[in-house]
Swiss-Prot record:
It is found in: Cytoplasm. The keyword Ubl conjugation does not apply. This is GTPase Obg. Keywords: Cytoplasm, GTP-binding, Hydrolase, Magnesium, Metal-binding, Nucleotide-binding.
Amino acid sequence: MRFVDEAVITVEAGDGGNGVASFRREKFVPFGGPDGGDGGRGGSVYIQADDDTGTLVDYRYTRKFRAERGKNGAGANCTGRGGEDVVLKVPVGTTIVDVESGDIIGDLVEDGQRVMVATGGDGGLGNTHFKSSTNRSPRKFTTGVKGEFREIRLELKVLADVGLLGMPNAGKSTFIRAVSAAKPKVADYPFTTMVPNLGVVDADRHRSFVMADIPGLIEGAAEGAGLGIRFLKHLARTRILLHIVDVQPIDGSDPVHNAKAIVGELKKFSPTLAELPVVLVLNKLDQIDEANREEWCQHILTELEWTGPVFRTSGLLLEGTKEVVYYLMDQIEQQRELEAEDPEYARKVKAFREQLEAETREQTIAAKEAYRAMRKAQREADQDDDFDDDDDEVEVIYVR
C-alpha cells in the first residue's frame, strides 16, 4: 500500500431539517392548535484514530465528505430524525489542522480518540413554538441551520521513541531489522527505504520502545535534493535521535563529511529538532580490518569533535547492537520517570514539543510551496523552449 502522510480534505456537516407548520386535526376538533414538529439535527463529521489504519492514502482519492441532512419535522409534534454522523478513520499520530486559520483542531495520539471537525446544523422550529396569547394559530416556522463547512489538512507523524538518522545506505534499515521485528527492504543501493518504518524493540521482558527508520538524507536535502526533507517531520515526536554513520561508505565518500552534512541539514530544517539528544553509532565495522578499527573510529570521533555517547556496531553481524538497545531503553525510562515525578520538567518538555511541532509544520509547508514554485518555473521554461524551437523550424507550405 502506498504511504501517504499528508492530505487536504473538505468536510461538511449536515444541515438541520426544517420545522413545519401543522395543526391538530381530529374528529370533533375542527380548530385544533398548532402541532408542527421541529427539524432533526444535521449529522456531524468526526475524525477518529485507528490502530488498523497506517496511511492517509484513502484521502488522496476521496477528498470531500458530507454528513447527512436532518429530516424535516412533522405534524403531531413529531421531531425529524437526526442526520447520520460521518466518522473518518486515520492513523494514530495524525494532526488535524484548519487550512484557513492554521489552527490545530486536534492531535490524535491514542487508538479510538475522536475529534469533531464539523458540527451539524440545528433543526428548525415548528409552529408550536410561536403560539402566543394573541396568535393562537401561528403559521410561522424556521428552516434548519446550515452545517459547518471546513477545509482541513491531515498530517501524519509516526509515533516513536527513537528516530534513526543518516545518509542513504548507512545501514539504518539493517540496524532496525537487527534489533526489532521490522523487516524493511535492504539492498546495496541508496534510497532503498522510501517510507518510514516502525519497529518495536524489546530490551527485556516488559521493557520496550518504538524505533522509526526514515529515508536517508543527503547533502542539500533542505533545498530539495534526494528525497528532500519530506520525512524529517516524522522525527518530531521522538525522544532520542540515533545517528547512524557508515564508517566505510561503499561510494568511497568521507564518513566525517557525511556525518557533518546530516547534522547541517537537520539544523537547516529545524534548529529545535537538532536540540534533541543524539546518540552516535559507528556502523559497518565488519567492513574494516579488525587491527585498524579502533584507530579509524577514533579518527572519525576526533574530526567530528564528538563528546556525546557513541557506540561501535555491525548491524549485519549483530555486533554491539544489544548495548545500544539497553542504553536507549535506560535513557527513555529516565525521561518518562522525570516527566511523571517533576511537573516543572514535564511542563518544559511539553513546551519544547509544541515548539518543535509548530516549527516542523511550518518548515514542511514552506518546503512544499518552494518545491511547487520550482516545478512551475521549470514547466514554464520548458514551454518557452518548445515555443522557440517551433520558430526555428522550416515552414512548409503545401500548394494544391
